[in-house]
UniProtKB/Swiss-Prot annotation:
Protein name according to UniProt: 3-isopropylmalate dehydratase large subunit
Swiss-Prot/TrEMBL catalytic activity: (2R,3S)-3-isopropylmalate = (2S)-2-isopropylmalate
Organism in which the protein naturally occurs: Kineococcus radiotolerans (strain ATCC BAA-149 / DSM 14245 / SRS30216)
PANTHER family: 3-ISOPROPYLMALATE DEHYDRATASE, HOMOACONITASE, MITOCHONDRIAL-RELATED
EC assignment: 4.2.1.33
Gene: leuC
Entry keyword Lyase: yes
Described purpose of this protein according to its UniProt entry: Catalyzes the isomerization between 2-isopropylmalate and 3-isopropylmalate, via the formation of 2-isopropylmaleate.
Single Gene Ontology BP annotation: L-leucine biosynthetic process
Residues that hold [4Fe-4S] cluster according to the record: C351, C411, C414
């Protein structure tokens, strides 16, 4: 029987097939843990007298609540006592149960969905879970990456399994070659605008087509990362030579004969030619351009060349009311060209766009320039390793000379759970993944953008792409 990529990975991990509508029991290959969704899970283990089932398949890092400045301060000196408590609790739980932890200040600390791939822990054909919705990131490797809740975190810690009902499958085909300046972030924002924030509900999305195959692994991670914003449980890309080249030589990747055997298996992880998807969506990648959001959900986006929608032109009452509410919160008027929207802050970071390629791309835009006087710019690498690599390449110097704030690794301004937050009414061009009301701080207004658009926006002070910029003025004349 012909099968899709998702079905192959699923079938390879069924420990017990569900009967009479019951869920299947899946084996979990990798469990990633952080400080926010794990405390009650460890409490449950402790109360039941259970150990962690597979310490070798469990790894923890501190990311959501971590400060991105003054990281050497004791946790007791953090202003947010809830954050300090969660970080301290994770350290105590990992020490008690023997879980490997990369804490603040560790050479491998960082956002969990950056750390896993860079260590080579995420590999094709795996099942990967974490108490975080953006675990879909790991599907870029041809793995089944799923966000889970705290009770499920406890179940995996205790049994290394998870009961789940099979998902439907949807093919997202992006044909053609992307134009210069159009990135993976623009592709996924366009996909979400096309199918809506609920369009993927109940599905695993498989991204296919020439435009997807031509992406780097970091670009594929950006795409899969935001599958959840389309309502999907997971997103996947079939592994290929790009995948293998990224993984080879990483600390936890197979070595020697084991590598050869792994690659042989990984090559089988592709959708069969005659397999059928439950739904299919096709986009012309060559027609895509830089994309930005205007509203309060990731599906409320338009090309940068477009304008804010005009509610009076929308016939559906429910849709019109939703647009009106979003515009009121965002402080925007219908019909405003997107390029006329001024921002107060630019944030480059998050598990969506904080990897070395993202930082290189943004640095190339701002090199030799100065930021707009009206804008503050915050650049937060996704991991300590990414930060060190960027500094070795001189990228930190480029950002500092531009006038940006160069920070330590963490989730930072992606979410209002640490000191990096927007003030009420403050408008931000952000490379993160969610623009909900209050996501980056109470009353904060978020426009989701690519690193290229973020960098150009920081130069002009209004939503912009690199094509909008004049050549930088030479500094040696």
């Amino acid at each position: 029987m012909a099968r899709t990529l998702a079905e192959k990975v699923w079938d390879d991990h069924v420990v017990r097939k569900g009967q009479d509508g019951e869920p299947d029991l899946l084996y979990i290959d990798l469990h990633l843990v952080h400080e926010v969704t794990s405390p009650q899970a460890f409490d449950g283990l402790r109360a039941a007298g259970r150990p962690v089932r597979r310490l070798d398949l469990t790894i923890a890092t501190e990311d959501h609540n971590t400060p991105t400045v003054d990281i050497d301060r004791p946790l007791s000196l953090l202003e947010d006592k809830t954050s300090a408590k969660q970080l301290q609790t994770l350290r105590e739980n990992c020490a008690e149960f023997g879980v490997r932890l990369h804490p603040l200040g560790d050479a491998e600390q960082g956002i969990v969905h950056v750390v896993g791939p860079q260590l080579g822990l995420t590999q094709p054909g795996m099942t990967v879970v974490c108490g975080d919705s953006h675990t879909s990131t790991h599907g870029a490797f041809g793995s089944l990456g799923m966000g889970i809740g705290t009770s499920e975190v406890e179940h995996v810690l205790a049994t290394q399994t998870l009961p789940l009902k099979p998902f439907k499958t949807m093919a997202i085909t992006v044909d053609g070659t992307l134009k210069p300046g159009t990135t993976a972030k623009d592709v996924i924002l366009a996909v979400i605008a096309e199918i809506g924030t609920g369009g993927g509900q109940g599905y695993v999305l498989e991204y296919r087509g020439e435009a997807i195959r031509n992406l780097s692994m970091e670009g594929r991670m950006t795409i899969c990362n935001m599958s959840i914003e389309a309502g999907a449980r997971a997103g996947m890309v079939a592994p290929d030579e790009t995948t293998f080249a990224y993984l080879e030589g990483r600390p936890h990747a197979p070595q020697g004969a084991d590598w050869d055997a792994a690659v042989e298996y990984w090559r089988t992880l592709r959708t069969d030619d005659d397999a059928e998807f439950d739904a299919e969506v096709v986009l012309d990648g060559s027609a895509l351009e830089p994309f930005v959001t205007w509203g309060t959900n990731p599906g409320q986006g338009v090309p940068l060349s477009g304008s804010v929608p005009e509610p009076e032109r929308i016939g559906d009452d429910g849709v019109r009311q939703g647009v009106e509410r979003a515009l009121e919160y965002m402080g925007l008027e219908g019909g405003t060209p997107m390029r006329d929207i001024a921002v107060d802050t630019v944030f480059i970071g998050s598990c969506t766009n904080s990897r070395i390629e993202d930082l290189r791309a943004a640095a190339d835009v701002v090199r030799g320039r100065r930021k707009a006087d009206s804008v503050r710019v915050m650049v937060v690498p996704g991991s300590a390793k990414v930060r060190l690599q960027a500094e070795a390449e001189g990228i930190d110097t480029v950002f500092k000379e531009f006038g940006a704030d160069w920070r330590f690794a963490g989730c930072s301004m992606c979410l209002g759970m640490n000191p990096d937050q927007l003030a009420p009414g403050e408008r931000c061009a952000s490379t993160s993944n969610r623009n909900f009301e209050g996501r980056q701080g109470k009353g904060g207004r978020t426009h989701l953008v690519s690193p290229l658009v973020a960098a150009a926006t920081a130069v002009r002070g209004t939503l912009s792409s690199p094509a909008d910029l004049e050549p930088p003025v030479p500094t040696n004349v």
